[in-house]
């Protein structure tokens, strides 16, 4: 098993020194889901929400969150992201919204946390915008789908 990179020999948390690492293209994809009633999902997809376009707001929130991950997660590095995408899909058969984020850069550390943060904050934004209509929505299944680049190589979740 790999060692924890953010813990030193004394067991103290620290930010990893990446100064000697080579710059490579790195990309990560993550997803999250928001479960809700059919009525709430229809309100979103039909554009009937009084606060406006829920998906557009969640998309912008996810993009902004990816850019600010280093301010939210204590040991993350500030990164110069070159791409952030947040896709939202209404899954009417299961009354869920699927959120997928993609982050990319050329740099010395990966973008997994940025992708996970983007998907998570987009989900939280959907909850925030719809909580007046439905308080028992469930945010879940937040996970890394794929990452490329860097020393640890390629990772892809099994389908």
Swiss-Prot record:
Substrate binds at residues 75-77, 113-114. InterPro entries: MoaC (IPR023045), MoaC_bact/euk (IPR047594), MoaC_sf (IPR036522), MoCo_biosynth_MoaA/MoaC (IPR050105), Mopterin_CF_biosynth-C_dom (IPR002820). Pfam families: MoaC (PF01967). Pathway: Cofactor biosynthesis; molybdopterin biosynthesis. One of its GO terms (molecular function) is cyclic pyranopterin monophosphate synthase activity. Keywords: Lyase, Molybdenum cofactor biosynthesis. The keyword DNA damage does not apply. It catalyses: (8S)-3',8-cyclo-7,8-dihydroguanosine 5'-triphosphate = cyclic pyranopterin phosphate + diphosphate. Its EC number is 4.6.1.17. It is an enzyme of class 4 (lyase). PANTHER family: MOLYBDENUM COFACTOR BIOSYNTHESIS PROTEIN 1 (PTHR22960:SF0), MOLYBDOPTERIN COFACTOR SYNTHESIS PROTEIN A (PTHR22960). NCBIfam families: moaC, PRK09364.1. Belongs to the MoaC family. This is Cyclic pyranopterin monophosphate synthase. It comes from Proteus mirabilis (strain HI4320).
